Amino acid sequence: MTDSDNPLILVTGNKNKVLEVKAILGPTATLEVLDINLPEIQGSVEEITREKCRAAAETIGGPVLVEDSALEMRALGGLPGAYVKAFVETIGNEGLNRILSAFDDKSAEAVCTFGYSQGPGHEPLLFQGRLQGRIVPARGVSSFGWEPIFEVEGEGVTLAEMEVGKKNGLSHRFKALVKFREWFLGARRPV
């Protein structure tokens, strides 16, 4: 179902994320992308997504979709979590591997949380997807920071090594967007 008169506004500055969201959502909605600077609070991925969604809805004055991702390493008690981008920018993927080298447990969970708000004053709804894996030395090339070190459980390859179509059909982002799509299509059906 598309509705070009009422596009779904996705707030992100990440062009690769836009391509992935469009590929996964398909004709579910007409996407309009806005790159606006939003404050990011300190907190869990859910708290950050919820606050980002509220701020975006207030800023644009209408319905909005936002996303935040996290990488939770079990041996580190869930760190770096929602702060993975800052970790990768500061110490790189090799730095994350070095930190984890002191632990036997290399398991990790990729987490993607989308927030949707109907507009100012509406409580954001959250849609979360999780993908199990483990941290390995970097393999493959990716435009998403930590994908070369995240080996998907049962696949034997990192997200960066995976063919795009396959990745878009099993990723943490895919799982979150499937939940959003089901809700969105159900919410738009006439009563």
Swiss-Prot record:
What is the E.C. number? 3.6.1.66
Q: Where in the cell is it found?
A: Cytoplasm; Nucleus
Single GO cellular component term: nucleus
Q: Which GO terms describe its biological process?
A: deoxyribonucleoside triphosphate catabolic process; nucleotide metabolic process
The alphabetized UniProt keywords are: Cytoplasm, Hydrolase, Magnesium, Manganese, Metal-binding, Nucleotide metabolism, Nucleotide-binding, Nucleus
Q: Which top-rank group of organisms is this from?
A: Eukaryota
Q: What Gene Ontology molecular-function terms does this entry list?
A: dITP diphosphatase activity; ITP diphosphatase activity; metal ion binding; nucleotide binding; XTP diphosphatase activity
This protein is called what? Inosine triphosphate pyrophosphatase
Report the source organism.
Aspergillus oryzae (strain ATCC 42149 / RIB 40) (Yellow koji mold)
